[in-house]
């Protein structure tokens, strides 16, 4: 029965209430914040559960009246009330199911986005720069803060790769479905014959990780320093300020050269490394849980083609949500809300199917 799934909630709330009264908990701010968040989440479910039970009670009362009432006009009024209550019941039940979905603990975190040019040479690098601008413009609209961490620029101003940080409310929740291969179809500025070309760039959205979230053993790291280089490969610094860190157990390599000081470059590289290792561990856990089963709307795999940007047709097609929007110019200027909200709804619907109550 639907309500049976909700029965343990009140006892969990009582346990958390007792935990919050412990003065020692306040000393551990991280654990305290986590407990408050869980308590508020369960309180939301309890409020909806109470509302649901109240509606069921009203339905039962009206059904009893209907079975006993002889006046036809009164019966019709009761039937109308029952129809309204049943609609309300379905609505509240759906809201409870959404609340019961797995809560992503990373949703409230800041993020690091990595964009890499894929197939398509210079045109792919220019598209990678376009994607960077799209996300930074969207961040401006959302009043989020962005900070460039590292980039490798081409002579025409494209990005072979770029890493940047976005800070703000629910950043990961909003942008987490952007990981994957973004494909572009357009006539490149380098193409003299005006032929349409298909290029691609890969986007990775990583939740920002604190030192306490993942443990990195210094013995597992190889750190190399070298001179920074600019577009075309020329050296832009006379000192060995650029840093490359290799995590030996996983083979993950991170490099950073955009800060003038070696120390700052190392800090930025470690920030990216923590995020990548955290993602690496999460992907392993997901594979174990799902036994390699991928959601129908997309796995979030970086190798998965998720979206096509067709410039001649002013069209953006998202292959997971199966929608095409003829507003490419607006989307490239950071008008992403409709697209992102549609995607979130698609993933939500799939989760409800996978976790049917």
Curated annotation (Swiss-Prot):
Cell compartments where the protein resides: Cytoplasm
Coiled-coil regions listed: none
Family annotation (InterPro entries): PCRF, Pep_chain_release_fac_I, Pep_chain_release_fac_I_sf, Prokaryotic/Mito_RF, RF-1
GO MF term set: translation release factor activity, codon specific
PROSITE patterns: RF_PROK_I
Key word ATP-binding present: no
Modification sites for N5-methylglutamine: 234
Biased composition (Basic and acidic residues): 284-307
One GO CC annotation: cytoplasm
Post-translational modification: Methylated by PrmC. Methylation increases the termination efficiency of RF1.
Pfam families listed in its UniProt record: PCRF, RF-1
Protein keywords: Cytoplasm, Methylation, Protein biosynthesis
Region (Disordered): 284-313
Family to which this protein belongs: Belongs to the prokaryotic/mitochondrial release factor family.
Family matches, as HAMAP family: Rel_fac_1 (MF_00093)
Function: Peptide chain release factor 1 directs the termination of translation in response to the peptide chain termination codons UAG and UAA.
Protein name per its UniProtKB record: Peptide chain release factor 1
Native source organism of the sequence: Borrelia hermsii (strain HS1 / DAH)
Underlying gene: prfA
